[in-house]
Design a protein with these regions (language model features):
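Conserved helicase motor core of SF1/SF2 NTP-dependent helicases
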Residues: 93, 97, 101-103, 109-117, ...
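N-terminal pre-P-loop "Q-motif" helix
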Residues: 57-73
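Conserved nucleotide-binding/hydrolysis modules and their immediate coupling elements
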Residues: 56, 170, 305-435, 439, ...
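Conserved helicase motor core of P-loop NTPases
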Residues: 193-359
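Conserved alpha-helical scaffold flanking the Walker A/P-loop in AAA+ ATPase domains
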Residues: 139-157
């Protein structure tokens, strides 16, 4: 019971959430014998922060400095804030502080793309949560299921664990993570609570903050560089329920009104294939089309067919195969649409020699079809970090074209350029949680129905 409401759980979700709560209570303790920082200790920490700022050329505001203090004081810290509020700068400062203390740090994120961005932003190796927990594949012949090697019996050997993009983490993955964290380890969870919740069950980050049990630092100041981006400014306007700013003078946020769906198709293809690669120096595969819906004239299914025919048309020597309702072609941009803990991947050198291997391809991983073998009936897909997976034809039911994807599937990703085609039919989907944080340019194509008003974009 929740007041007058009755809440129903699947058993597995309920017990996973209960287990997480119990483990969090056990982990949530002050890291200081005295319980609080003494004035001299706080002064010493802030002095060290000042040194880091000077060395790294940073300028932290009071909330960012508070986040560093809380990370020293507590075993669990939640760091949240919208785009442009300095989460990455704060993470970098925390890393440099604990590094200076001689502590071992692990950095992780839910997806390969997010982990790669974290590595680039911090200069410190970040891994996917699955890889950090050492996912091992299933062995059907022995009845062994896929599992994590790191758990309560074999915890992570880290003094500090920082997990980014926590809004993407579902309750089951969070439970597996907590099992591998031993008491005395600092756990710092970072994310934007205003982003969409995870695709899997639970809204872990939002629930942790709402519990008011754990220390939370919410960054609010939009820094100067971010203030110059209309994307960031409009993201915060939408979160506040305010009208977005539309101006032809913007460097990164554009609203293009077109009067019919065919015209939108034509203009999108021109943008992706010709105009944007020149303007933002991005290949067509760096440009992502996002849409709120799967069905309809501007839904994922229709748009993928339109964009595939224009951006990766058939040609002599380019193999293709029809599997179910989808035509796959060498060179296609694709996405894995469900977690598969058994799929094996490998990274090969330029000479074709395997240099790394592992298991597991996960919901939202995006790649390129490199080869279709009609004789063996297999499809070779290359994912981030040059991971190559060979799918059998039946396994390709877990893969779909990704020239256009749903906004929900884009969660936690960043792209150089995004195009969002919209109809007023999607009005019910235009909530503030559907705005994404994008790395560079943002284009919005919208077909206005009679009697509609531009304020509807709010």
């Amino acid at each position: 019971k929740n007041g007058e409401d009755t809440i129903c759980y699947a058993f597995s979700y309920y017990y996973a959430e209960l287990a997480c709560a119990r483990m969090l209570v056990e982990l949530n303790q002050t890291m200081l014998p005295e319980g609080e920082l003494l004035p001299a200790q706080e002064e010493a920490i802030l002095k060290r922060v000042d040194q880091i700022q000077q060395q790294e050329g940073l300028m932290l505001d009071e909330l960012q400095r508070k986040a560093v203090l809380e990370s020293v004081r507590n075993s669990i810290l939640i760091l949240t804030g919208g785009p442009g509020t300095g989460k990455t700068t704060t993470i970098n400062t925390i890393i440099r502080y604990f590094e200076g203390e001689g502590l071992d740090l692990y950095l992780a994120a839910p997806t390969g793309r997010a982990a790669k961005r974290m590595t680039e932003a911090t200069g410190y190796e970040a891994r996917t949560i699955h890889r950090m927990l050492e996912l091992s594949g299933a062995m059907p012949e022995s009845g062994k299921k896929a599992s994590f090697e790191r758990n309560e019996d074999n915890p992570l050997e880290a003094d500090v664990i920082i997990v980014d993009e926590m809004s993407m983490v579902d309750i089951h993955l969070f439970q597996s993570l907590l099992k591998a964290v031993s008491p005395g380890t600092r756990l710092i969870l970072v994310g934007d609570v205003n982003q969409l919740p995870s695709v899997g069950p639970g809204q872990v980050l939002a629930d942790l903050i709402a519990s008011e049990v754990f220390p939370v630092v919410c960054l609010q100041k939009i820094f100067r560089q971010a203030q110059e981006s209309d994307i960031v400014v409009n993201a915060h306007r939408i979160n506040k329920g305010e009208q977005i700013a539309l101006t032809n003078k913007s460097r990164d946020f554009f609203f293009l009104e077109r009067n019919s769906v065919p015209v939108i198709y034509k203009h999108m293809v021109q943008l992706i294939g010709e105009m944007l690669p020149k303007y933002v120096k991005a290949s067509p595969f760096d440009i992502q089309v996002l849409t709120p819906m799967r069905k309809g004239s501007l839904g994922v299914e229709t748009l993928n067919g339109v964009l595939q025919s224009c951006l990766n048309p058939p040609s002599e020597g380019k193999k293709e195969v029809q599997l179910g309702d989808t035509l796959f072609r060498e060179g296609d941009k694709v996405m894995q649409i469900k977690n598969n803990y058994q799929l094996e991947w490998e990274v090969v050198s330029r000479y074709g020699i395997p240099i790394d291997k592992g298991v597991g391809i996960f919901n939202g991983d995006m790649g390129i079809i490199r080869e279709i073998d009609e004789y063996a009936q297999t499809v070779l897909v290359e994912y981030d970090e040059q991971r190559r997976v060979t799918y059998t034809y039946p396994q390709m039911e877990e893969v779909e074209l990704a020239y256009a994807i749903t906004i929900h599937k884009s969660q936690g990703s960043q792209y150089k350029t995004v195009i969002i085609p919209m109809l007023m039919d999607y009005k019910i989907m235009l909530t503030n949680k559907y705005l994404r944080e994008i790395n560079a340019k943002f284009y919005l194509c919208k077909k206005m129905n009679d009697g509609s008003d531009k304020s509807d974009i709010r």
